[in-house]
């Protein structure tokens, strides 16, 4: 399927985009967490950690429910196939490898900038179990996939089909950033950076029409930052990590403060540069001259 054909195919969407946004957020932020909480409330021994394998499933269940809910809604209400949502069956493994390298590389560049500024350094984190690292990779992979199916696979297409690609990317990225508003240490810089992350992922999606690739970038970014480097991922730190990231205290604008380096000036600079490169390719690929859809 050509990119132009994929973009135009979404004009047949049947559901109002505002309804689609409401349902998607309801599934992501309310229904999936509540079902998970209900299940583990009924089985307190699992929540208490008597069964480590099932206890670990608590980290994966909300994302699995979100993926299932969105796919069922998109298929039932909008008659969209997996391919329509960017879940192509071709080169899935290759897409994950390339995306993972890109995601890890981006966060490495952000960290390098902070180290050069003397605002960060690393120390050994003392991980005791390789299984914990692998579990962390799995959790971030499934979470990344669930968020990308929601934001890029479904919502981006819904918004772009009704409001045009440019407006779709902008609104989608604002919602993506706003979804993190209650995270620890959230700031205006963090919002701007997450908005830029959204535009980068959206641009990459329109260039590839491949949710696997975009999900891998998202997952590898979080995994590298949280599990490998031991930094806060959007305000959340992990108990198990390979290294420990130390940032200069008192200069939150440079380091991102308690939100983590995703809210840092270094991250802003890297994202602006990457976004500029990708957006030029999007404009060239789709010959964009207007922010509104050309029907």
List the model feature ranges, each with a label.
Residues 107-110, 140, 164-181, 194-198:
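Small-polar-interrupted transmembrane alpha-helices in polytopic inner-membrane proteins
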Residues 35-58, 79-149, 156-161, 291-295:
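Juxtamembrane helix-loop-helix connectors linking adjacent transmembrane helices
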Residues 1-82, 226-295:
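N-terminal, membrane-interfacial amphipathic/helix-forming hydrophobic leader that caps
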Residues 7, 146-171, 203-210:
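Membrane-interface helix/loop boundary segments of multi-pass membrane proteins
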Residues 132, 136, 149, 191-202:
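Alpha-helical transmembrane segments of multi-pass membrane proteins
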Residues 119-126, 179-188:
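Membrane-interface helix caps and helix-loop-helix hairpins in membrane proteins
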Residues 62, 175-176, 193, 217-222:
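Transmembrane alpha-helical core residues of multi-pass small-molecule transporters
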């Amino acid at each position: 399927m050509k990119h132009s054909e994929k973009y135009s195919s979404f004009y047949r969407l049947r559901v109002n985009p505002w309804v689609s946004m409401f349902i998607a957020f309801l599934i992501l932020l309310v229904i999936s967490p509540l079902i998970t909480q209900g299940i583990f409330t009924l089985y307190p021994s699992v929540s208490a950690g008597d069964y480590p394998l099932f206890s670990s499933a608590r980290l994966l269940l909300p994302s699995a429910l979100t993926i299932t809910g969105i796919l069922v809604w998109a298929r039932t209400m909008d008659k969209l196939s997996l391919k329509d949502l960017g879940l192509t069956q071709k080169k899935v493994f290759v897409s994950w490898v390339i995306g993972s390298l890109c995601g890890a590389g981006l966060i490495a560049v952000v960290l390098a900038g902070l180290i050069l500024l003397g605002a960060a350094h690393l120390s050994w984190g003392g991980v005791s179990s390789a299984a914990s690292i692998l579990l962390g990779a799995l959790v971030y992979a499934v979470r990344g996939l669930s968020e990308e199916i929601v934001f890029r696979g479904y919502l981006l297409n819904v918004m772009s089909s009704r409001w045009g690609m440019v407006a779709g990317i902008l609104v989608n990225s604002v919602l993506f950033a706003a979804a993190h508003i209650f995270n620890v240490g959230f700031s205006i810089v963090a919002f701007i950076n997450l908005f830029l992350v959204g535009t980068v992922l959206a641009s990459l999606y329109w260039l590839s029409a491949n949710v696997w690739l975009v999900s891998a970038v998202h997952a590898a970014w979080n995994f590298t930052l949280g599990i490998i480097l031991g930094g806060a991922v959007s305000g959340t730190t992990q108990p198990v990590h390979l290294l420990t990231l130390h940032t200069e205290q008192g200069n939150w604008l440079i380091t991102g403060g308690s939100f983590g380096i995703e809210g840092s000036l270094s991250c802003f600079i890297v994202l602006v540069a990457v976004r500029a490169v990708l957006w030029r390719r999007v404009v060239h690929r789709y010959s964009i001259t207007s922010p509104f859809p050309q029907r």
